[in-house]
């Protein structure tokens, strides 16, 4: 695959050695991601108090404590929304420091809605195959939960927040890191480094294994290829967000070692080894996911190569 318009449109300082600029890009991406997560964790307490106080002021009689309790009941919404801090850091850097346009992050208008639809469909297909293999192979089982209206609305309302969370991770590691490295170096190196950082960032998650990290890296490679193939961030935003949403809030899997607050299905893990079931990390720790991702990577790569031959 060749570099698209996103990468070609990036303004960089050619005077800085490629090795130095690559190290700087990796450091800055890590710093913005960890810094944004730290900021969101520091603000959760004051934010809940502020909401409780304002609500009590405008709607007296509810009680600050009860409002705060309500806030923590919906804490997953805040945790996902808080990724906006990371997104804003990258937008500020691109617009103010780099003086590049947001299109260099992949935010292009052309076909954006179509790519969102493709990304959602791709994740539904991938997770559908994984769930089917789990069920038919006796690796685990799914049971439909009896839910009232409130948890159903809770689950449905989470989808755009998962898109924000997953999309922000894609902007950080693919839209910014991959494209900046590729602008100075080559695409294989950019995809390898951005995917490796993506895997490293998950090392602290509960239940992490070698296979789970490998799958995260493979997913990063897939996302990198999709970004280059579409020359847009929108497909990988939708693919990543939907992947997490379907895992946790539809199928009841752990999402990279983190449990979902509510789900349409309850998942019961079988008695097989962790490399098969995924263990505490969830489906992303299973060899089944490895195979699905490998097939996806090969298909996208071949599609990209075919498109380039057609253009030539």
How should these model regions be labeled?
Residues 82, 122, 197-198, 215, ...:
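Transmembrane alpha-helical core residues of multi-pass small-molecule transporters
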Residues 1-102, 248-312:
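N-terminal, membrane-interfacial amphipathic/helix-forming hydrophobic leader that caps
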Residues 80-88, 152-159, 172, 214-221, ...:
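Membrane-embedded alpha-helical segments of multi-pass membrane proteins
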Residues 32, 36, 40-76, 98-168, ...:
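Juxtamembrane helix-loop-helix connectors linking adjacent transmembrane helices
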Residues 168-193, 225-232:
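Membrane-interface helix/loop boundary segments of multi-pass membrane proteins
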Residues 140-145, 201-210:
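Membrane-interface helix caps and helix-loop-helix hairpins in membrane proteins
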Residues 162, 187-203, 216-220:
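Small-polar-interrupted transmembrane alpha-helices in polytopic inner-membrane proteins
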Residues 19-27, 77, 116-121, 152-156, ...:
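Hydrophobic alpha-helical transmembrane segments
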